[in-house]
Amino acid sequence: DDSNAASGGDSAKAGSYKVGVVQLVQHVALDAATQGFQDKLTELVEADGGKVEFDVQNASGESANCSTIVNGFVSAGDDLIMANATAALQAAQAATSDIPVLGTSVTDYGTALGISDWTGKTGTNISGTTDLAPLDGQADMLKELFPDAKNVGLLYCSAEPNSKYQIDTIKPLLEAQGYTCTEFAFTDSNDVASVAQNAASGSDVIYIPTDNTAASCTEAIANVVIPA
């Protein structure tokens, strides 16, 4: 019934909780976020005399898989959904307005959830943590490290709205430092190496925002830019 839906399934009444975890892609940073969440929630629940069961699933970098996974959690009546990365959060938003959803590894919730008048609260069943770095501080640090550079390449995945948000925010900050900025956007992991090569050829310094695809392709990017 509706009273159960507001807090997930029926299991919570007995002090036993079912938690679905959807992670966009396997990556050391995302893996650590998932493990940290599991460890702390287990500690808190067991300290209160309860038990928690996790269903951890990885979408292998595919947004469509996130939707399939989250819909499975909803059908199973899970008590809580943890969405690791923006695409996972967006899938959870589309799948349920009743089961509580926690996000992590999400840069900007307003952008991710399509909230234009973002105030820091969703006003919905969704909450979570952000990994947004202080972009003004990053611009200052880049200037401190590379004071003689002229051209900054902004390398990011065009399919990730949070990455575009960061680029749009830091670009004017870098331009105010006197840099000429050029955007180099790749669509997915298939063209990251070629776009990174273009960025390396046309830039003195390359800036990469918090970007899931770039993070999962660190080796491919390094193989291009380090020799350059």
Protein language model features and the residues they cover:
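Extracytoplasmic "Venus flytrap"
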Residues: 12-39, 44, 55-64, 159-163, ...
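Beta-alpha junction/loop-to-helix N-cap segments that form part of ligand/metal-binding clefts
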Residues: 58-117, 211-225
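An alpha-beta-alpha
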Residues: 19, 37, 127-174
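Stable alpha-helical elements in mature extracytoplasmic
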Residues: 29-40, 65-69, 84-88, 92, ...
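Short, low-complexity, disordered segments immediately C-terminal to signal peptides
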Residues: 1-16
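Short, high-confidence coil segments that cap the C-terminus of an alpha-helix
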Residues: 78-79, 149, 203-204
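Pocket-lining segment of extracytoplasmic ligand-binding domains
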Residues: 161-228
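Structural motif
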Residues: 52-75, 184-200
